[in-house]
């Protein structure tokens, strides 16, 4: 445990950021999972859920929780999965 007052505050700040970042990452994972499940079930809401997943990924990238390239990769792979299953 830190003894310096500023470092104690820093630990608290880091913990707050960690919790927020974990929540954002969890939202992204849930959105992607729901979109993939809807795609596999040929649900009529699949396109809507894919758009929601893209939105969550974009928010995570803009907040700096996810790297730009990782966000682009996740969006691209979700689109590829959607298009591949839609044509079958």
Curated annotation (Swiss-Prot):
Name a Pfam family for this protein.
Ribosomal_S20p
Q: Does the keyword Ribosomal protein apply?
A: yes
| Annotated GO CC locations | cytosol; small ribosomal subunit
GO molecular-function annotation terms? Answer: small ribosomal subunit rRNA binding; structural constituent of ribosome
Q: Name one GO biological process term.
A: translation
What are the annotated disulfide bridges? Answer: none
Query: Which domain of life does the protein's organism represent?
Result: Bacteria
Question: Which InterPro entries does this one have?
Answer: Ribosomal_bS20, Ribosomal_bS20_sf
Keywords of this entry: Ribonucleoprotein, Ribosomal protein, RNA-binding, rRNA-binding
SUPFAM superfamilies reported for this sequence: Ribosomal protein S20
Q: Which family does it belong to?
A: Belongs to the bacterial ribosomal protein bS20 family.
Query: What is the documented function of this protein?
Result: Binds directly to 16S ribosomal RNA.
NCBIfam families linked to this entry: S20
Name of the protein this chain belongs to: Small ribosomal subunit protein bS20
Q: What gene does the UniProt entry assign to this protein?
A: rpsT
């Amino acid at each position: 445990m830190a003894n310096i007052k500023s470092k104690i505050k820093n630990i608290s700040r880091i913990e707050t950021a960690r919790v927020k970042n974990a929540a954002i990452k969890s939202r992204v994972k849930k959105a992607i999972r729901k979109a993939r499940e809807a795609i596999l079930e040929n649900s009529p809401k699949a396109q809507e859920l894919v758009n929601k997943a893209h939105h969550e990924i974009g928010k995570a990238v803009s907040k700096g929780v996810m790297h730009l390239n990782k966000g682009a990769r996740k969006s691209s792979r979700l689109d590829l999965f959607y298009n591949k299953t839609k044509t079958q």
